[in-house]
Amino acid sequence: MLRAALLGLAAVPVAACGPALVTTRPRLTHGVASGFPRTDGAVIWARSDRPAALIVETAATESFSDTRRFTGPLLTPDADGTGRIRLTGLPADSEVHYRVTLDADGALSEPATGVFRTAPATARDVRLIWSGDVAGQGFGINPDIGGMTVFRTMAERNPHFFIHSGDTVYADVPIPETLPLPDGRIWRNEISEAKSAVAQTLDQYRGQHAYNLTDANYRYFNAHVPQLVQWDDHEVINNWYPGEVLDNDKYTEKRVDILARHGHRAFHEWQPLEAREAVDGRVYQRVSYGPLLDVFLLDMRSYKDPNSPNRQQHGTILGARQAGWLINEMASSTAVWKVVANDLPLALVVPDGTTDFEAVANGDNGLPLGRETELAHILSQLKARKVRNVVWLTADVHYTAAHEYSPSRAAFTDFDPFWEFVSGPLNAGAGKESTLDGTFGPRADFVHAAPPGKQSPLDGYQHFGQIDIDGDSGDLTVTLCDAAGTALYTRTLARS
């Protein structure tokens, strides 16, 4: 587990520079972040307020007494001042302290520090956390409660990494200065220009991510916990699909493909990831974390077919290429556990309007139709190729749950039993329990969802999940937690 490391700015002697020099120094505007750890390093992200080179130094301790120096790209307005560098050549299974500085033609920023752990090369205990759905439904950074404190709580669990299951922002939901609650209380928000209206331009989409990182808890989390990040719909607009044309008076730009292009670019600029490391240069990829764990990040948004009653003979949510990739990569994995990060749930019914559905399930409890046919193919192939120890993790529905899937209860039976765990939201409106479609035989072993009138983060229905893999036995334990870190549910799965 990671030791706590202070995130802060180094003091600069006043005598070292006059006022004119101070104004020309670059500034790190939104902290630092790490992502996608490997055995020899990770991606380091930062943002500058002016053109400047990204400089990263690493050390084994926070004293930075023996450093390695990495020179990254020039951060420019073309990418909204953001940039990243993949660190390589570091020892496996090691705590790495890093210090980020900006260099603008010799004028140096004050540094910011962070810490991460490289992935192990041998079997050892592994802890990850996951969740999603950040600052939605008008619930933003509330100064009355100290901001988005759930991020501080998650950082204190000392995970090796965090899977962000999507809805990293709510680009389609403005954040007002105040929000009246059903019980008469008032939720107050810190506000920004970008969050005053729905996002339509590239700069407005960028501003969604910038807003979240004005929260000190989130910046602390970013500096202490590496992330694997995927997207869902609200990085663009609710329930979107490729080719959609909006009938929505809030938008002057009706072409969702244009909005998605802006949302995609802003997402990749502002998250600690390298787009070129994804299979298609977008999201989906396999991340190995030692011999006990492989994570398969999915993109269930870019290739899905239009929202519909979802009862056609064949449908797609991953697309043939991604589905084939998932099957082959899982079959070739030698890791004990294969964790699939699906940004949309497998059996929860997610309506889009009165007749259409936007996720996998169509609500008829029968044999696979529509997008269910693609999942059926994947599950049957995993069974045929004897892929064992599979766990699916998701968010999206704004509550937490444990779902056990079994062919003994299912309309479609050609698959091995497995578990899917749901978590979220993070400082967003809490959701009510959704209906489970019986096609793949799910059973809700646990649900913690908001009752009517209890959607505010003040009401306690915010969640994250935690997975611990025992380095000796290889067993996997799932713990579903509330925003205070209280364990609501625990389940241990034995390796096969």
What name fits each language-model region?
Residues 7-11:
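Hydrophobic helical h-region of N-terminal Sec-dependent signal peptides
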Residues 3-6, 18-496:
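Metal-dependent phosphoester/phosphodiester hydrolase catalytic core
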